[in-house]
């Protein structure tokens, strides 16, 4: 029974309110601890992580994880208790996540650059007993968490070594490791697939000021992340006749069976063999050995966007457990430096990177162009692919990147913090059409249906929309789905529903299915702007504006309007050295949009406010728009 009700939010909550019962009760094969032990046992001497001059094999990494896990046990951290991780991408971030998971405690992500009240809220909302944090943010976090009653320990790490003074009473990460054994922690309980895996905080939604914690158990979270790769793989399998895509596929998952199928890769039965092989062997020691033996040198993946963002976290762990890749981190992960990225790809021979749309792709394009103008060259022959998720990636920027690096395969995925199956599209330079994220995702039939059904449901009728009619509906995901929102029973009931004995997540995103049976994402239902009774999605208008050759970035939001109820405001960042007038934007939009979708207000800024994840800082943006329009608009 949930207790401590306060409005729609609970003061206290328990994982028992979310716990699922599975047929194979008491198993532990789908836990992060089990996955790490498998890698350390099967390929102990393969490189696991690289950051700057530091290199760790799976055996070394597992030893450090065990030391931290034993330290956490000595600190009396119990199974099911929440432990936060605050920092940017680092080996220590990964060690912390695995160590917390090994003892059955629950890791949760903290964006260290979030507003202070938001950080305080997340730590308090999780009822955290400890926070493991990067030294740069330690003193600030220590100051704002003084009055959180549940918090017992602050543990501070540096990327390799400490660079900032410690807050009073904090523990030193490396000292804890030095004082504890590298042997596997001895538990007097079992961590099972049914247990609390992690709590993931995304962006604030709807009327909520702060983000909601998304509850995952191991069965859904670990297995779902493992399966995420095969959903990314699907559009690649559908186009294996393209040599670039085939090379990228073999490089990402170099199983010898796949190589043997190369001569017949255009035949449907060859693809069926690959899919069947994956379904039978995924996550096993046999599969790990197959991938490890398929390539003498490690396949190297680099998460560029932050790990505290769910899309990056999921894809990074997917690459580890499904592809057995070596993970490379930038030496300095924030602020993002595109030159450092390209130099690292060149030096470490990185195979693929993970980004969040235009916010990361545009600086990469700019640096490649600048290097070309200055006569500098990068040896990027190893770089085969870019996987993006979470933030829209415009067709124009995709094409520019492919023109600069013709060998690249672009994989653009659609997903949410609340479900792991990501539905993807693959693009190469030769493609005539490079759609934005969420478009041209295969909806029915073929290989795209082997994982989990994905539907578009008419909000009024409750039935699936008719394809090819333009009928709008809400995206609904089935398969590996989170269990609910922490301390938010009403939101959980609204968004997580059992339909036909299977759990579904109602995403709140709107779109339709075109005549080719492809999903077409239009916008988020919560961001719909009503103009004189007509529904307008800001994303649709933004895509048109961003296609203008002088525009670097843009965002479109709705504001109150006396006559029409709401009106559109376009906030635009121009390319360096370019000029554009408000009327130019209006005329450009009128060429492809009806009059009611044309922005009433156009504003130009030097740079748009984006979070470290690449997402727009909506609160800052709205404050700016309000100040420009005047408080009477609100």
List the predicted regions and their residue ranges.
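ATP-dependent adenylate-forming carboxylate-activation enzymes
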Residues: 87-88, 105-123, 135-140, 326-348, ...
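Conserved AMP-binding/adenylation subdomain of ANL enzymes
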Residues: 222-303, 310-354, 366-367, 371-372
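AMP-binding/adenylate-forming catalytic core of the ANL superfamily
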Residues: 114-121, 131-133, 346, 353, ...
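Conserved AMP-binding/adenylate-forming
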Residues: 54-55, 69-114, 304, 535
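Structural core segment of the AMP-binding/adenylate-forming
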Residues: 2, 74-75, 102-175, 187, ...
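ANL superfamily adenylate-forming
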Residues: 13-14, 139-196, 218-225, 240-250, ...
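N-lobe entry segment of adenylate-forming
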Residues: 1-75, 79, 160-167, 185, ...
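Gly/Ser/Thr-rich phosphate-binding loop
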Residues: 171-174, 321-322, 342, 351-355, ...
């Amino acid at each position: 029974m949930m207790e401590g009700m306060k409005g729609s939010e609970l003061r206290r909550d328990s994982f028992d309110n979310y716990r699922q019962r599975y047929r194979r009760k008491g198993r532990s094969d789908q836990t992060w601890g089990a996955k790490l032990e498998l890698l350390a046992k099967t390929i102990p001497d393969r490189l696991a992580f690289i950051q700057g001059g530091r290199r760790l094999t799976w055996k070394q990494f597992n030893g450090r994880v065990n030391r931290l896990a034993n330290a956490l046990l000595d600190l009396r951290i119990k199974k099911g208790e929440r432990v936060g991780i605050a920092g940017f991408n680092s080996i220590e971030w990964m060690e912390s996540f695995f160590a917390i998971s090994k003892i059955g405690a629950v890791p949760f992500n903290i964006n260290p650059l979030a507003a202070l009240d938001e950080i305080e809220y997340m730590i308090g909302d999780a009822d955290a007993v400890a926070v493991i944090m990067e030294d740069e943010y330690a003193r600030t976090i220590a100051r704002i968490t003084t009055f959180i009653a549940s918090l017992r320990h602050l543990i501070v790490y540096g990327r390799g070594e400490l660079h900032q003074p410690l807050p009073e009473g904090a523990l030193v990460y490396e000292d804890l490791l030095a004082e504890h054994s590298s042997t596997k922690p001895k538990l007097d309980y079992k961590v099972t697939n049914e247990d609390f895996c992690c709590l993931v905080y995304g962006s604030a939604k709807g009327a909520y000021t702060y983000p909601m914690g998304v509850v995952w158990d191991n069965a859904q979270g670990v297995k779902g992340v493992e399966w995420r790769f095969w959903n990314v793989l699907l559009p690649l399998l559908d186009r294996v006749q393209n040599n670039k895509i085939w090379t990228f596929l073999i490089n990402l998952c170099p199983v010898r069976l796949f190589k043997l199928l190369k001569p017949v890769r255009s035949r449907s039965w060859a693809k069926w063999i690959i899919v069947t092989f994956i379904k039978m062997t995924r996550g096993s020691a046999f599969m790990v050995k197959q991938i490890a033996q398929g390539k003498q040198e490690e396949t190297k993946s680099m998460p560029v966007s932050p790990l505290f963002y769910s899309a990056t976290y999921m894809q990074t762990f997917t690459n580890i457990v499904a592809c057995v890749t070596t993970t490379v981190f930038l030496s300095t992960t924030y602020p993002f430096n595109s030159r450092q990225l390209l130099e690292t790809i060149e030096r470490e021979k990185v195979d693929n990177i993970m980004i969040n749309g235009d916010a990361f792709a545009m600086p990469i394009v700019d640096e490649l162009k600048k290097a070309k103008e200055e006569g500098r060259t990068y040896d990027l022959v190893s770089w085969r692919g870019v996987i993006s998720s979470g933030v829209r990636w415009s067709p124009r920027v995709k094409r520019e990147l492919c023109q600069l690096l013709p060998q690249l395969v672009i994989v653009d995925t659609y997903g949410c913090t609340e479900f792991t199956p990501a539905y993807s599209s693959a693009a190469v330079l030769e493609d005539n059409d490079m759609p934005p994220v969420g478009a041209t995702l295969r909806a029915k039939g073929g290989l795209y249906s082997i994982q989990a059904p994905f539907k578009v449901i008419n909000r009024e009728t409750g039935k699936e929309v008719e394809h090819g009619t333009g009928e709008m509906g809400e995206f609904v995901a089935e398969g590996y789905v989170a269990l609910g929102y922490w301390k938010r029973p009403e939101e959980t009931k609204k968004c997580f529903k059992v339909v036909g004995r299977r759990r579904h997540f109602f995403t709140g995103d709107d779109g339709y299915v075109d005549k080719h049976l492809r999903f077409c994402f239009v916008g988020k239902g919560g961001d719909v702007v009503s103009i004189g009774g007509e529904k307008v999605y800001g994303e649709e208008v933004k895509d048109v504006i961003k296609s203008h050759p002088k525009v670097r970035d843009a965002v479109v939001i709705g504001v109150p309007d006396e006559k029409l109820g709401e009106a559109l405001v376009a906030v635009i960042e121009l390319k360096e050295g370019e000029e554009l007038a408000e009327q130019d934007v209006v005329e450009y939009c009128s060429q492809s949009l009806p009059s009611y979708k044309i922005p009433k207000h156009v504003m130009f800024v030097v740079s748009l406010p984006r979070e470290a994840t690449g997402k727009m800082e909506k609160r800052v943006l709205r404050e700016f728009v309000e100040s420009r329009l005047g408080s009477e608009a609100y």
